[in-house]
Amino acid sequence: MDINNKVKEFANFIKNTNEFKDMNKSKINLEKNRNLKKQLDTYINKKNTIYSNYRMEDASKKIMQLNKEYSDFFNLPSVSNYIKHTKQFNSMMENLYKSIEKELLK
């Protein structure tokens, strides 16, 4: 058994899930608008900077403020769809990781 082949099979399985397809489709749709893509990248960079420069309690407050600043942006249909589908994909992946962990601990 070659683990690399199993990894490729697993990745292909993930690519064929509705969660991945929906996330990818909404990402492509979002990226069609360069301004929205740029705003999303700016938000992500600001969020990452906050998490790397502040303690957790302070970071949480800063993130809440950042999210308020971007609330109109988050409510745009293409952004909202991307965020929703990304959360669904991440949830699916989290469940996969938990299943793998469960199998490893048997």
Q: What is the predicted function of each stretch?
A:
Residues M1-K106:
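Terminal, compositionally biased segments used for targeting/anchoring and flexible tails
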